UniProtKB/Swiss-Prot annotation:
Gene name for this UniProt entry: truB
Source organism: Methanopyrus kandleri (strain AV19 / DSM 6324 / JCM 9639 / NBRC 100938)
Gene3D superfamilies: Pseudouridine synthase, PUA domain
Protein name, per record: Probable tRNA pseudouridine synthase B
EC number from the UniProt entry: 5.4.99.25
Reaction catalysis annotation: uridine(55) in tRNA = pseudouridine(55) in tRNA
Amino acid sequence: MSGDKDRRLPFDRDREMITKAEVETDPRYGCPPEERPIEEYIMKGVINLDKPAGPTSHEVVAWVKEIFGLSKAGHGGTLDPKVTGVLPIALEKATKIIQTLLPAGKEYVTIMHLHGDVDEEELERVVKEFEGTILQRPPLRSAVKRRVRPKKIYYIDILEIDGRDVLMRVGCQAGTYIRKLCHDIGEALGVGAHMAELRRTRTGPFSEENAVTLHDVKDAYEFWKEEGWEEPLRHVVRPMEEGLEHLPRIEIRDTAVDAICHGANLAAPGIVRVEKGIQPGDLVAIFTLKGEAVALGVAKATWKEMLHADRGIMVDTKRVLMEPGTYPKAWGLKTPGE
């Protein structure tokens, strides 16, 4: 069996932040995401929901909106009605991060039912041939055009075999059809196969280990509304920043924040810390020194260039996540340590 190996999705990399300048943040402005007032916390929150079998992803989002009385919410990747598991739901202002979750790597646990008997060693060998880049044509009932698409399978681990039922863990690129994968493995084995059950265990930085149920969400909201008890709600709703943990990270000075909130690009002098490994073209998340998400952008330089440059645009700002005025304009503001 191959289930005991350390298998990782692309963003499960070893990460290291490199400091460019020793700078502190002014406590008068902004606040750590976990310490936001509860109303703001909800509006900038993400729920790592464990979707039950039955409802559509859209219906689950509608229920969450109804519980909180929200006008806007969105999910990070559709699950079919019968499929259970990780469905990140972004609330109100946090819906701006949804587009970063949709292409993020996914992990599933599936039961593949074989239509004939197969030797275990042969099964292991054939399954391993499906790791790497494969070509998939979406199923007939898919909503997308049925042209062949390359998809990356990062790993397939056989966890258990019970007769003709094979329990597998699959780490894959977004948009991979596990139903089609099971069918194609069956064809390669010469006996045929179909997907009997499916559960999503990871979406980007969210995993089933800390997923919550709709019941948890409703109870936590009612505890807060009726008794003023915030703790359960702060457990089921997480800061939107947790939904950006799969992206390369750049931290900036207080004095650079407001300009970016107005749509300016990030220049070299504003950078305090950079994640090692950033390359031009990478989608990056820009944070304050308190850990607040400021914006999403596309890197224009390598991490080394960002560390050593004293001028020039390092990141093109693509999506602003923080409201202007959270931090003062640069003039008249000196952060401690500058």
